[in-house]
Swiss-Prot record:
This is Uncharacterized transporter VC_0195. It is found in: Cell membrane. It comes from Vibrio cholerae serotype O1 (strain ATCC 39315 / El Tor Inaba N16961). Keywords: Cell membrane, Membrane, Transmembrane, Transmembrane helix, Transport. Residues 22-149 form the EamA domain. Belongs to the EamA transporter family. The keyword Ion transport does not apply. The chain crosses the membrane at residues 13-32, 42-64, 77-96, 106-125, 132-150, 154-171, 183-202, 217-239, 246-265, 275-297. GO terms for cellular component: plasma membrane. It holds the Pfam family EamA. It comes from the Bacteria. It is a multi-pass membrane protein.
Length: 302
């Protein structure tokens, strides 16, 4: 069947979106394979090798002018320094949660994230919430509240992941720097701390790459690919798809994490988690229905 250029572009965008969110969803398999390495050490390798790969990509794409332009814009420079701290913290919490058998909490965090984004948009960008959006956010809050009050536990990992990534997304939206340039500068800001840790501070059986097996070293170097490849797929998808369309793929990642946690790694799906997940899933269904209704209304208005 013949497809127009726009349809071909949209099809490519859908494939890129599925690829990006699938890679994010199965990333825990990679981090589980590095279970013998400390979270801080994995984070440091992630920063170093992501920086190296991004530097190569920027050089090949002749994008150094874009990098220099951001560095010479104080507002963007300092905001990127803040986003570097946020994404670094997010990466560290995520790596720790996977290797400490808290993958369900990580999954919950990324389910909560779209709802938190709506709330942050209202608080900091002047966006107005529709009634169903309010209802969805309230349901999510009730789910977390029940876990706190009835079961006496707080999903700290989930809240930390959702909050750090939510504020990261908010600031990156304000900065308006392309993903590749932004992530390159963020890893550049984190590079000194990562290098100091790996060279002088790390004192573990895996910290000396000269003594590691080549298989382990290859896994550590692949941290750059694991970080950068899904991001490139995501930015390619974002350039080809409407934001509303892209939004429906964002649940692939946490859903795959959830399935991995329960079916592959045997994490306990306890009653407190089940209730919280039920409320979050219900909130996301309402959130998605509201998005569909808003999209149809906008098309009719045109």
């Amino acid at each position: 069947m013949f497809m127009t250029p726009d349809q071909q572009d949209a099809k490519k965008g859908i494939l890129l979106a599925i690829s990006a969110y699938t890679m994010w969803g199965i990333a825990p398999i990679y981090f589980k394979a590095l279970g013998a390495v400390s979270a801080l050490e994995i984070l440091s390798h992630r920063v170093v090798w992501s920086f190296v790969l991004l530097a190569v990509l920027i050089h090949l794409g002749r994008r150094w002018r874009s990098v220099v332009g951001v560095v010479h814009t104080p507002r963007k420079f300092w905001l990127l320094l803040v986003t570097a701290l946020l994404v670094g913290g997010n990466w560290l919490i995520f790596i720790w949660s996977i290797n400490a058998n808290h993958m369900l909490d990580a999954s919950l965090g990324y389910y909560i994230n779209p709802l938190l984004n709506v709330l942050l948009g209202m608080l900091f960008l002047g966006e107005r919430l529709r009634k169903l959006q309010w209802f969805a956010v309230a349901l999510a809050a009730i789910g977390v509240g029940i876990q706190l009050v009835v079961f006496g536990s707080v999903p700290i990992v989930a809240i930390a992941l959702a909050t750090s990534f939510g504020f990261y997304g908010l600031l990156r939206k304000k900065i308006q720097v392309d993903a590749q340039t932004g992530l390159f500068l963020e890893t550049l800001f984190m590079l000194p701390a990562a290098a100091i840790y790996l060279i002088w501070l790390a004192d573990t059986p895996t910290s000396d790459m000269a003594l590691n097996t080549w298989q382990l070293n290859l896994l550590l170097v692949c941290a750059g690919v694991v970080t950068t490849l899904p991001l490139l797929c995501f930015t390619g998808a974002a350039a080809r798809l409407k934001l509303s369309t892209l939004g429906f793929f964002q649940y692939i990642g946490p859903s795959l994490m959830f399935l991995l946690a329960v079916l592959v790694y045997g994490e306990a799906f306890t009653s407190d988690k089940a209730i919280t997940f039920a409320f979050i899933w219900s909130a996301l269904v309402i959130f998605s229905v509201d998005g569909l209704k808003a999209g149809h209304a906008a098309r009719r208005a045109r």
